[in-house]
């Protein structure tokens, strides 16, 4: 499950962009380095997933900026909390203008923006896109410690683990399941979604196929595998699009009589945060449901 990207590029390019940023830094009085504080006073996130962790783990006064994506309720778990927070498209000049003590980025954040911020002396924490629950714990811990709230990160991890440890009694034989997302994308072995499926008591049939961690799965193959549970995206806002039309295919509607449909809103497991537990609950309920 690739981490969501904000589609950002750095403002300005080459030496000209660097000179403009340096001038802006001089004007703001940020070019001189200062001793690191125990907790950065102003933190700007330029990644959807670190937006959520910053808002959930940081003090409100620390949240100096997030991405514009976090203000959209369709794809953000913290849209309400993000309203009123300065939002950027991740351009380096926008970020510098918010006077950050720390910037949170991610694997899919514009490398040009990250490089330019570092060139002018802005500290950047580059979070990863975890593919395992251990990786999720590590990234929560990394961000929490970076913003000076390691204790809150540990509390978030403990609550996530508590919810992921709920007793589950899947029916036997274990239900065979497949994830089908827009454009036919699915989740195979080595993905975070695969680990959640298996933990919930489901057999991921994609593991029986030669499919990348995240790859495309033909609809006909889904039907031919004899699945018991089909996991699709929950309702998406906006008009119908070609990417989602396959989820309305007549063949899938016919499966309704013998296949349980589990709808998981994409934002629940797009990022590595506490809402993963909500996605897990949907999967576990499907695993326990009678035929």
Region roles according to the model:
Residues 3-14, 20:
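A cross-taxon signal for low-complexity, glycine/charged-rich
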Residues 20-33:
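Bacterial N-terminal signal peptides
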Residues 34-38:
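Sec/Tat signal peptide C-region and signal peptidase I cleavage site
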Residues 39-42, 102, 112-185, 206-208, ...:
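Extracytoplasmic substrate-binding proteins
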Residues 41-108, 112-113, 202-205, 252:
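A short, structured surface patch at a secondary-structure boundary
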Residues 47, 67, 107, 182, ...:
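Short secondary-structure boundary segments
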Residues 92-100, 120, 216-226:
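Short helices/loops that flank or line small-molecule/ion binding pockets
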Residues 192-214, 234, 261-263:
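His/Asp/Glu-enriched short active-site or ligand-binding loop at hydrolase and phosphoryl-transfer sites
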């Amino acid at each position: 499950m690739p981490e969501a990207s904000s589609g950002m590029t750095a403002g300005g390019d080459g030496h000209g962009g660097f000179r403009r940023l340096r001038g802006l830094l001089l004007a703001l009085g940020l070019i001189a380095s200062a001793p690191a504080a125990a907790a950065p006073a102003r933190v700007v996130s330029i990644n959807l997933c670190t937006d959520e962790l910053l808002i959930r783990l940081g003090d409100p006064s620390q949240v100096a900026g997030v991405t514009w994506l976090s203000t959209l309720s369709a794809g953000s778990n913290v849209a309400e909390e993000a309203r009123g927070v300065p939002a950027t498209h991740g351009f380096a000049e926008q970020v510098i203008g918010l006077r950050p003590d720390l910037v949170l980025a991610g694997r899919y954040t514009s490398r040009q923006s990250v490089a330019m911020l570092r060139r002018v002396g802005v500290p950047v924490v580059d979070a990863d896109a975890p593919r395992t629950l251990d990786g999720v714990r590590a990234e929560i811990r990394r961000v929490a410690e970076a913003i000076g709230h390691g204790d809150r990160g540990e509390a978030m991890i403990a609550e996530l683990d508590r919810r992921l440890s709920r007793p589950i009694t899947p029916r036997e034989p274990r239900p065979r399941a497949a994830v089908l997302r827009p454009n036919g994308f699915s989740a195979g072995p080595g993905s975070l979604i695969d680990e959640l499926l298996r933990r919930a008591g489901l057999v991921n049939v994609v593991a029986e196929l030669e499919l990348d961690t995240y790859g495309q799965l033909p609809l006909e193959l889904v039907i031919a595998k004899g699945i018991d549970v089909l996991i699709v995206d929950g309702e998406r806002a906006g008009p119908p699009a070609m990417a989602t039309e396959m989820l309305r295919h007549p063949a899938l509607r016919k499966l309704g009589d013998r296949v349980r449909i589990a709808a998981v809103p994409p934002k629940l497991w797009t990022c590595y945060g506490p809402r993963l537990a909500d996605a897990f609950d949907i999967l576990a309920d499907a695993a326990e449901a009678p035929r």
